UniProtKB/Swiss-Prot annotation:
SUPFAM superfamilies: Coiled-coil domain of nucleotide exchange factor GrpE (SSF58014), Head domain of nucleotide exchange factor GrpE (SSF51064). It comes from the Bacteria. This is Protein GrpE. Participates actively in the response to hyperosmotic and heat shock by preventing the aggregation of stress-denatured proteins, in association with DnaK and GrpE. It is the nucleotide exchange factor for DnaK and may function as a thermosensor. Unfolded proteins bind initially to DnaJ; upon interaction with the DnaJ-bound protein, DnaK hydrolyzes its bound ATP, resulting in the formation of a stable complex. GrpE releases ADP from DnaK; ATP binding to DnaK triggers the release of the substrate protein, thus completing the reaction cycle. Gene3D superfamilies: 3.90.20.20, Head domain of nucleotide exchange factor GrpE. The lineage of its organism: Bacteria, Pseudomonadati, Pseudomonadota, Gammaproteobacteria, Enterobacterales. It is found in: Cytoplasm. Homodimer. GO terms for biological process: protein folding. It comes from Salmonella typhimurium (strain LT2 / SGSC1412 / ATCC 700720). Its main location: cytoplasm. The keyword Electron transport does not apply. Keywords: Chaperone, Cytoplasm, Stress response. GO terms for cellular component: cytosol.
Length: 196
């Protein structure tokens, strides 16, 4: 026997063995290439992920900016509305001492004296027309008695015992208060009833 015949497995010719070895090599090669990933495909997949993340960030940014713009628009409208409503506040604050002076003049005027009747009537008409004008611009007088004390519109100066007015209610007005479009610009100075 030759050396080739000794090494061959039984029943197989040497050519068959060589062909089998080539088939095994060929069969292995396609498996190796299937396991290998093309670096371009991997890079494309990474870029697609990055693109999706960037698009999500961009959408979030756009939505956030839209919300901020809407909030800014709303705040600006509110600020403008308040500016229109309360633009007169300084002016009204300057008028209040004049109104107070007319009120005091009426309180101390001798209404029984016929010589003073014309002057008292003039002061009353002046005060009435001034209050009518400021009411047109949203100013309201706080001068009610026998109402519960409201710290938003009343400033308690003293407590006085009273049987006619329930405890905790306004008994008397020391100085009138005023509101401008619902905002207190000067609280009324009041005396408050307390139980005996």
């Amino acid at each position: 026997m030759s050396s080739k015949e000794q090494k061959t497995p039984e029943g197989q010719a040497p050519e068959e063995i060589i062909m089998d070895q080539h088939e095994e090599v060929e069969a292995v090669e396609p498996n190796d290439s299937a396991e290998q990933v093309d670096p371009r495909d991997e890079k494309i997949a990474n870029l697609e992920v990055q693109l999706a993340e960037a698009q999500t960030r961009e959408r979030d940014t756009v939505l956030r900016i839209k919300a901020e713009m809407e909030n800014l628009r709303r705040r600006t409208e509110q600020d403008i509305e308040k500016a229109h409503k309360f633009a007169l506040e300084k002016f009204v604050n300057e008028l209040l001492p004049v109104i107070d002076s007319l009120d005091r003049a009426l309180e101390v005027a001798d209404k029984a004296n016929p010589d003073m009747a014309a002057m008292v009537e003039g002061i009353e008409l002046t005060l009435k027309s001034m209050l009518d004008v400021v009411r047109k611009f949203g100013v309201e007088v706080i001068a009610e008695t026998n109402v519960p004390l409201d710290p938003n519109v009343h400033q308690a100066i003293a407590m006085v015992e009273s049987e006619e007015v329930p405890a905790g209610n306004v008994l008397g007005i020391m100085q009138k208060g005023y509101t401008l479009n619902g905002r207190t610009i000067r609280a009324a100075m009041v005396t408050v009833a307390k139980a005996k």
